[in-house]
Amino acid sequence: MEHMDQDTSKRFKYWQTRTIIATMVGYALFYFVRKNFSLAMPGMETDLGITKTSLGLFLTLNGLVYGLSRFVNGILADRMNARYYMAIGLALCALANFAFGFAESVSGTLLGWGIGKNQMQAMILFMGVMWVLNGFLQGTGFPPCARLLTHWIPPKELATKMSVWNTSHSIGAGLVVILCGYIMGHYGAGGWKYCFFIPAAISFAGAIVLFIALRDTPTSVGLPEIPGTGAEYKKDGKKETSAENKAFLRRKVFGNPLIWILAIANFFVYIVRFSVLDWGPTLLSQSKGLSLENAGWLVALFEISGILGMLFSGWATDKFLKGRAHRTCVFCMLGSALFIFIFWQLPSGAPVWLLFASLCAAGFCIYGPQALIGIAAANQATKRAAATANGFTGLFGYASTIVSGVGLGALAQHCGWGYAYVAMIGIAVIGMLVFLMMWNAKADGYEEEQV
């Protein structure tokens, strides 16, 4: 760091790297206990007789509660210790997954074993409660990360380094679909419960590691704050009052038209992303004739391509567009629509490499905006409100599960997968048009704060 002496700079870089790696691993594990559901769905449908519409309702309720939780926890995380917040939240998510896996046993114990209507209803109700609870607890994952990263990474480096960090989404989702794909391939439809038990055990262990590895801010380890990022807002050593904080949030988040545009765009980005991620195994097996194990691998490759897309989009944003992440998103959404169209047009007997290439190209494109929206929101709101801004955009993002969850499930069940593909393409185009609305916006809101 330019403003620090050599020893301080060395210590700062060590803690910066440690924070990035620890939060990457931690957030990947949040996906272990969230995206395991998509691979368990076909088994639950076969083994338990749960309909696609009901499974889609689980996804929708989980997503809505998660989006609301991210918003609430975003406001809280800006003013609390991120280390405790993230570690405890991950541990509780793991416990909720353990409980979900025991749903059949719980309903059988309470109402007697069998396949009666009452037991089925009780089991579905218990599953729904546990998955909604998990959705709420998942909201303790990203907000503390947004706080940590904006305190440890300078704004001019944020797009590149946070794009690297954002690969945790794809690493976590990719690894868990491979793991659960293997479980379902090995145990068959009845193995769905192990898709919850095994990821939960891994995540609980990870929560302990997070608690040991993380620290909240540079000052908590005796290091200076990054200059030029509003660190001076605690003037004369006085703590910011609640009224001052609320006024700042109104101006930089809730009354900021750029944050609203990013939030609305996030709604469309997440519909496309979750349509593939949540329904991918079912869609690929039913519309393209792949086995569940191979479908799991293809969804994992979609995630891996997303990693490359995030890294490239972050690098291109800083290198060519001077940090204007919203401009990169325009091109990414156009590419997403194009490659989903190509994938849709491939026949069920098409070579696997063609299916691979087109779906991976779509993943490469859609994960650029998924990563960059958080970066753009953090920069526009400044680090004082980074978690709140990301919670707000996340609220819109996970409201998208109304469409990608129960909406897409009902559309596929009643009209077929062809209509679902058309919906995804149209939504990607709308998302591109929303991003175009802020084409001329500046890269961040720090300059405005210093005027």
In which residue ranges do the predicted regions lie?
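Residue-level signature of mid-helix packing/kink "hotspots" within the transmembrane helices
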Residues: K35, G63-F71, G139, A173-G174, ...
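Extracytoplasmic gate region of multi-pass secondary transporters
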Residues: F37-M41, N256-L311, Q370, S404-G405
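Cytoplasmic membrane-interface "Motif A"-like loop-to-helix N-cap segments
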Residues: R79-L90, K319-M333
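C-terminal ends and interior cores of transmembrane alpha-helices
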Residues: A91-M120, L334-S348
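Cytoplasmic helix-loop-helix junction between adjacent transmembrane helices
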Residues: M130-S170
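Glycine-rich segments within core transmembrane alpha-helices of 12-TM secondary carriers
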Residues: A159-I178, M184, G306, G394-S404
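Helix-loop-helix hairpin linking two adjacent transmembrane segments in secondary transporters
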Residues: W165-P218
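C-terminal transmembrane helical hairpin of 12-TM major facilitator-type secondary transporters
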Residues: G323-I373
